[in-house]
């Protein structure tokens, strides 16, 4: 992949299962070295897209290139340049961690001497070198996921695909996995493409594409997406709420209401506004809180529903896709 060439380039990608269009003409580019996330509910088309980019599904239409290679015409070249961590575990529990990696190295034709050194590197990276001889079936869910990531890195891919890398894990283990993912980007000079339906995970990506019902409805950095949704929400507690409301209107041109026992209003750039509030309101403030727009707010602004609501409606969409596969 020449310097400056997109790590992933997608133009008009479509996937149909019978009469059901699971991916509907999406377009996007992933830059080398970035963490790029697909955020959306189950059934949005995220995994179907990854499966096409990894050559596991043939597109119905459109063009996709990964590491400079066409996913249809150059499937072998694509596969040599990618690592893939599936949503569902694919390790052999009756082999040791080292044996699982050795089998993977042989599949990719990694020379034995190079494979031994690379196994040490990736197992140390994910904190499993001391457990390399243990059977995988004795590992916790988080340890297995870390081993899956190590396996995906073994052949030094240009692009690592992670399909819901922390699904089913507890919050502490999810946080640990994300520490490894960020370290990978910094130490391996690799592009990371992941899918998730966890808002807090999408927040850590360099850029995210929000996907709903097979379409990309928004694509940008998390900060810019949230900034485009609306204003920050500020809540203040005072000894005289009505005086505070009048002062906000007169001195700042801000309309406020009393909600849930606090004076509540919306402003742009709330972090910069709060110091001005203390200096110029003229009414004593007991406490203040600031809430910025969330990615769930972004999702709702583009789709008219929360991601949780979309999860429920996506069940019906996935049933249609399943019928289309038959």
Protein language model regions, located:
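Conserved ABC ATPase "signature" region
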Residues: 102, 106, 113-131
């Amino acid at each position: 992949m020449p310097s400056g060439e997109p790590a992933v380039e997608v133009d008009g990608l479509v996937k149909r299962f019978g009469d059901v269009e699971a991916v509907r003409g999406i377009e996007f580019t992933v830059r080398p070295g970035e963490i790029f996330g697909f955020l959306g509910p189950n059934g949005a088309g995220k995994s179907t897209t990854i499966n096409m980019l990894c050559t596991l599904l043939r597109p119905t239409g459109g063009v996709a290139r990964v590491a400079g290679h066409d996913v249809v015409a150059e499937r072998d070249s694509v596969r040599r340049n990618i690592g893939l961590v599936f949503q569902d575990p694919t390790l052999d529990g009756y082999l040791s961690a080292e044996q699982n990696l050795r089998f993977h190295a042989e599949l990719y034709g990694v020379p034995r001497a190079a494979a031994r050194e690379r196994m040490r590197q990736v197992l140390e990276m994910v904190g499993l070198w001391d457990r390399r001889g243990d059977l995988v079936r004795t590992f916790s869910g988080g340890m297995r996921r870390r081993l899956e990531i190590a396996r995906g890195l073994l052949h030094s891919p240009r692009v690592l695909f992670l399909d819901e890398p922390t699904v089913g894990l507890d919050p502490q283990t999810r946080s640990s996995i994300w520490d490894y993912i960020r370290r990978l980007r910094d130490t391996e000079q690799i592009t990371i493409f992941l899918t998730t339906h966890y808002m807090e995970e999408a927040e850590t990506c360099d850029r995210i594409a929000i996907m709903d019902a097979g379409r990309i409805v928004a694509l940008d950095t998390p900060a810019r997406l949230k900034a485009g949704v609306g204003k920050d929400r500020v809540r203040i507690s005072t000894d005289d709420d009505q005086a505070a409301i009048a002062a906000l209107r007169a001195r700042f041109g801000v309309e406020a209401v009393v909600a849930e026992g606090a004076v509540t209003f919306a402003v742009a750039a709330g972090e910069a506004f709060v110091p001005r509030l203390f200096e110029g309101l003229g009414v004593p403030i007991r406490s203040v809180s600031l809430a910025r727009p969330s990615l769930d707010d972004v999702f709702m602004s583009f789709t008219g529903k929360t991601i949780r609501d979309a999860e429920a409606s996506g069940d019906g969409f996935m049933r249609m896709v399943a019928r289309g596969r038959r």
